[in-house]
Amino acid sequence: MFCYQQNFFNPTKEVDRNVFWALVGAPYTKELIDGIRIRKEKAATIMAANVEEEQILASAALGEADQLKKKLPAFIFQATFDVTKSKKGYEGAWRKQAATRLTGLVVMDIDHVDNPVDVTRGWLTDDCPCLGDRCRELGILLVYVTPSGHGLKVVFKARTEWGNLIDNQHRMAALLGVEVDEACKDASRMSFICRKEDILFINEQELFSYENKEFAEKYNDVYRGGHSQPTLFDTVRR
C-alpha cells in the first residue's frame, strides 16, 4: 500500500482502491489539470512566435500553471511514513525521508515528450504487441500521463537484485528505451496525480496491495539515513 498527500501542509494518508479512484476522478482534479495544460500550451505558442515583447506573457502563463500544479494532491508510491511530529509539533505520517517505510514500488518519470502515448508504443515487442501484456511482463503496475500532458509516470515492482530505487529506474529505462529523471531518486518523492482519463494502464489487483519486504528490509535504513544515490556501478544506462 502506498500513500498520498493532499497538499504540502498535510500529513500523508494511505491509498486504497476507493481513495485512488476518488482522487483521479474528482472534478477538481480535472479542472486543475485542464487549467495547467491550457496555460502551458499558451506559453508554448507565445515562445514559438519568438516575439520578445510577449515573452513576459509566456512566463506568466507558466507561473500560473505551476501554481495550479501545487494545488494538486500527490501520490508517494515508493513509501509510507512513520508517525512523527511536524515542525509545529503536530503528529502525523509526515512525508519525511527519515521516517520512510519502503513499499517495494518504484516510480519513474519520463519528461519532455511530445506525445506520451506514442512513447508507450515504443515499448511493445513482437511477443507483446499489447501495452497491458508488456506491462505485466515487466512488472509495471501503473502508467499515466502527467499533469503537463508531456510526461509519463511509470510505477513498477522493485527488484532487489537490481539495486535501490534509482538503480531500478535505470534498469527499467533501459528495457523501455527511455531516459531517467535523476531527480526522482528519493523515497519521499511526490508524484502529482492525474485525471482518470490519463491512465494508460493499471493493474488494480496488485497496485493497492503489493509489497516487497525483502527490498524494504535491505533499503529502509539506507533511505532513512538520507542515502539515495545509485549503488550499482554496472547499472545499464543509455
List PLM regions with ranges.
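Signature for HUH/AEP ssDNA processing cores
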Residues: 1-150, 157-163, 231-237
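DNA replication initiation modules
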Residues: 5-9, 13, 94-117, 158-238
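Short Gly/Ser/Thr- and Asp/Glu-enriched loop/turn motifs at secondary-structure junctions
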Residues: 145-152, 185-190
